[in-house]
């Protein structure tokens, strides 16, 4: 069975996007990229909400013609990886390897298939829907040293879920990576 894993940047006060969805507060460096790349390497498919799909679709393909760099390598990975996009309104996507899903419950069948992990990028509303199904196995949270005061909450309205801290890492820029697994 595949694991369903959430990967998210979060402010200290629990927001994963600013008041207008902006991400300009996210602190990144090469060590964080390398750490996230280790998680990404376990993925057999990317999982997106429609909003995240549109954001990723508008950004990553634009880097494919740039000189080689970490971003270009990731853009190539994004281009080829199967992308499970959950949306009730999308009817099709012109992006490579997109598999549309209408209902969050479809993730349960996806988990039963063979392959590497299913990695949710961002998509807080989808994370909450999957939490309601008790479908998420792991959380990789990059907690940023900032208080946003308002914005898009990561766990707003999520159901009570026990977690166990599997590992943590402190980065030079003050970001703390927390890896949680389902608790007992």
Feature map (PLM): residue ranges:
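Enzymes that bind and transform nitrogen-containing heteroaromatic metabolites
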Residues: 1-184
């Amino acid at each position: 069975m595949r694991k369903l894993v959430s990967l998210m940047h979060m402010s200290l006060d629990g927001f994963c996007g600013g008041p207008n969805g902006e991400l300009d507060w996210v602190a990144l460096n090469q060590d964080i990229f390398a750490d996230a790349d280790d998680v990404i390497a376990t993925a057999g498919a990317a999982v997106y909400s429609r909003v995240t799909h549109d954001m990723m679709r508008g950004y990553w393909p634009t880097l494919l013609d740039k000189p080689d760099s970490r971003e270009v390598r990731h853009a190539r990975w994004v281009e080829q990886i199967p992308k499970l996009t959950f949306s009730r309104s999308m009817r099709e996507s012109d992006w490579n390897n997109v598999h549309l899903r209408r209902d969050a419950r479809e993730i349960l069948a996806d988990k039963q298939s063979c392959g590497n992990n299913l990695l949710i990028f961002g998509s807080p509303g989808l994370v909450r829907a999957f939490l309601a199904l008790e479908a998420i196995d792991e959380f990789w949270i990059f907690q940023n040293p900032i208080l946003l005061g308002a914005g898009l909450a990561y766990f707003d309205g999520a159901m009570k879920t026990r977690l166990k801290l599997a590992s943590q890492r402190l980065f030079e820029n003050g970001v703390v990576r927390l890896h949680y697994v389902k608790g007992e």
